């Protein structure tokens, strides 16, 4: 049984991974006075996904209207998972018109019928526009608010239903919005339910206008139970979820949390709108839901479109519409994928959201820290949180693990030799250059494992990075290129800060001089290291030109080359940037290259 399930799951995952939402499947438009959005124009046979979210909730919606309610705040998990289909959810939206039941979402629903449904997506929203027949139009829109701060935001989404009667006679309708709570940890979704280490019993509680569903872990094998705030591979304290509606009759029926709005009338040439809130449970679900509904805008481009416009970087000065659309898409994708870690108490940007949400592993700290480069320009508090997130995972000897999984769990084999320390120093230097926040160097951080409560100063962590880099027995060509670009830049910021000891500055200066001497002694430079070579102040423009030409001939130039290229040839950097961004065919799921795109844009502007 397990083998059959696993093979089926792998086939489904492979099919989903192979599909990406290309530029040709988007018809971009500009909302009046707002942000760009697009209409999906691809085949209904495909299964693209549209990610909306903030640091506390992810809603991955499918073309057929099914959504996955996802969180990475603790273990990456789905809270309305389909029991038999990985990477899919279980929810229902049903209209009753003229005694006829019309399913709006799911396989075989109206959402999959050509000509009966159009799908639009933009910053913070996905909208499905239906033609129900008999002169009745229906819009079902899912919206999320942006994160107010990296750690603070509303962990919920708003479902806005609008029925419009274009006919000459009033119509009576009924509507159900429901989801089926079923908790599945991402790392377990390819394991048959009977063979997972834990299963989860659901319990529900109905109060005024709210239904709450909670999940209790039940071991199915020998699994030492963990304290909820202690690191663990498996989830022992899943978040609870809730559904709120001021207009509906709420009921738990056959495992569904259901909001039913029965027999309402839509008069001729009139509209009828109502809201349903679904999210992660807190101290006052009703109060939070009502506060969010009050902030909802009467806009078909997202219930919080004005908030998103204010929150995202302003790219309106970009004259090339296609480039501008991609900039907004990349910036929004970063915001939609970033996640607050309850274990580390910091927010980070997953380098690969698809991987994290599918397999439950945050890969990799190298990607996470590089994603902070763009945040130095767009959201310095987020950049700082990412730096802290990576620093908190550092071992006593200065090694940074490649990744973590579960609830803050880092296995011993993740502490491998890598070059992430140099990347942290690079981002820290960039952050200090942009903000002048030298007081950050005096801060103390609680370090891994967090439950022990051990604190270390940022300065001591920096010193351990330096010792680790200095004492490496072998310096590769890539490491040499990185050192030439990073060490002088970082040393300059440490001197300006006045926070590090004279002994440290002297030792760092000596090592930097040695690294520069080693770099200058090289006769060849690998085009694979182009992002560091172009950033280095030790090469002439002529040398950089040769390196760039070689890399372009090999087809190995991507967005990571742009920041360094901008330092010696701004016109070419701008041209190459626009060429690369228009080749971007990535899906809406945020990727590290989205972060490099935004960072490159701001570097070019300097």
State each model region's role:
Residues 232-303:
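Beta-strand-rich recognition/accessory modules
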Residues 98-156, 245-260, 332:
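Extended, loop-rich substrate-binding clefts of extracytoplasmic carbohydrate-active enzymes
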Residues 361-480, 573-576, 580-584, 593-606:
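Aromatic-rich carbohydrate-recognition surfaces in CAZymes
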Residues 86, 143-253, 298-307:
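Polysaccharide-binding surfaces and accessory modules of carbohydrate-active proteins
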Residues 23-91:
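Beta-strand-rich N-terminal accessory domains
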Residues 24, 301-359, 385, 389:
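Low-complexity, Ser/Thr/Pro/Gly-enriched N-terminal "stalk/linker" regions
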Residues 9-18:
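Bacterial N-terminal signal peptides
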Residues 364-379, 459, 478-496, 506, ...:
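Active-site core of glycosidic bond-cleaving carbohydrate-active enzymes
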């Amino acid at each position: 049984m397990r083998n059959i399930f696993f093979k089926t799951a792998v086939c489904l995952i492979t099919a989903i991974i192979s599909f990406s939402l290309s530029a040709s499947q988007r018809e971009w438009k500009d909302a009046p006075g707002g942000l760009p959005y697009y209409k999906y124009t691809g085949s209904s046979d495909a299964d693209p996904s549209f990610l909306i979210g903030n640091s506390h909730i992810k809603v991955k919606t499918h073309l057929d209207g099914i959504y996955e309610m996802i969180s990475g705040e603790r273990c990456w998990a789905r809270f309305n998972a389909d029991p038999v289909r990985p990477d899919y959810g279980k929810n229902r939206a049903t209209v009753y018109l003229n005694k006829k039941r019309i399913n709006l979402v799911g396989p075989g629903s109206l959402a999959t019928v050509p000509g009966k449904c159009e799908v639009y997506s933009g910053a913070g929203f996905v909208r499905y526009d239906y033609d129900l027949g008999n002169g009745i139009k229906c819009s079902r829109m899912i919206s999320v608010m942006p994160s107010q701060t990296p750690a603070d935001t509303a962990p919920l989404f708003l479902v806005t239903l609008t029925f419009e009667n274009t006919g000459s006679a009033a119509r009576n309708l009924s509507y159900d919005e429901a989801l089926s709570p079923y908790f599945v940890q991402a790392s377990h979704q390819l394991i048959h339910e009977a063979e997972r280490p834990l299963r989860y019993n659901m319990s529900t509680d109905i109060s005024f206008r709210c239904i709450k569903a909670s999940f209790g872990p039940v071991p199915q094998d020998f699994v030492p139970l963990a304290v909820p705030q202690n690191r663990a591979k498996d989830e022992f304290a899943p978040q609870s979820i809730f559904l709120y509606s001021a207009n509906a009759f709420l009921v738990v029926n056959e495992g569904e949390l259901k909001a039913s709005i029965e027999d309402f009338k839509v008069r001729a040439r009139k509209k009828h709108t109502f809201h349903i809130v679904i999210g992660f449970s807190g101290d006052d679900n009703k109060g939070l839901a009502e506060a969010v509904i009050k902030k909802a805008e009467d806009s078909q481009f997202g219930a919080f479109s004005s908030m998103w416009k204010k929150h995202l970087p302003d790219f309106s000065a970009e004259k090339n519409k296609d480039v501008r659309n991609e900039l907004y898409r990349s910036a929004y994708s970063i915001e939609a994928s970033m996640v607050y870690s309850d274990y580390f108490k910091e927010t980070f940007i997953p380098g690969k959201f698809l991987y994290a949400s599918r397999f439950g592993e945050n890969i990799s700290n190298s990607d996470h820290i590089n994603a902070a480069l763009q945040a130095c320009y767009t959201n310095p508090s987020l950049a700082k949180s990412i730096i802290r997130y990576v620093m908190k995972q550092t071992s006593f000897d200065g090694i940074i693990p490649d990744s973590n999984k579960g609830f803050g769990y880092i296995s011993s084999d993740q502490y491998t030799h890598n070059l992430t320390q140099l990347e942290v120093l690079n981002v820290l230097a960039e952050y200090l250059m942009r903000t002048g926040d030298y007081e950050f160097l005096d801060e103390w951080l609680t370090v891994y494992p967090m439950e022990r409560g051990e604190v270390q100063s940022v300065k001591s962590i920096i010193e351990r990075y330096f010792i680790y880099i200095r004492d490496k027995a072998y310096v590769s060509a890539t490491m040499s290129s990185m050192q030439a670009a990073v060490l002088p830049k970082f040393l300059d910021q440490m001197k300006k800060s006045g926070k590090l000891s004279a002994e440290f500055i002297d030792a760092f200066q000596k090592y930097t001089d040695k690294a520069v001497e080693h770099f200058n002694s090289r006769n060849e430079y690998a085009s694979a290291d182009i992002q560091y070579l172009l950033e280095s102040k030790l090469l002439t423009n002529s040398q950089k030109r040769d390196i760039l030409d070689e890399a372009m001939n090999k087809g190995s130039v991507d967005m990571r080359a742009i920041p360094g290229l901008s330092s010696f040839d701004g016109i070419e950097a701008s041209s190459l940037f626009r060429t690369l961004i228009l080749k971007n065919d990535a899906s809406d799921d945020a990727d590290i290259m989205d972060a490099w795109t935004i960072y490159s844009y701001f570097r070019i502007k300097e």
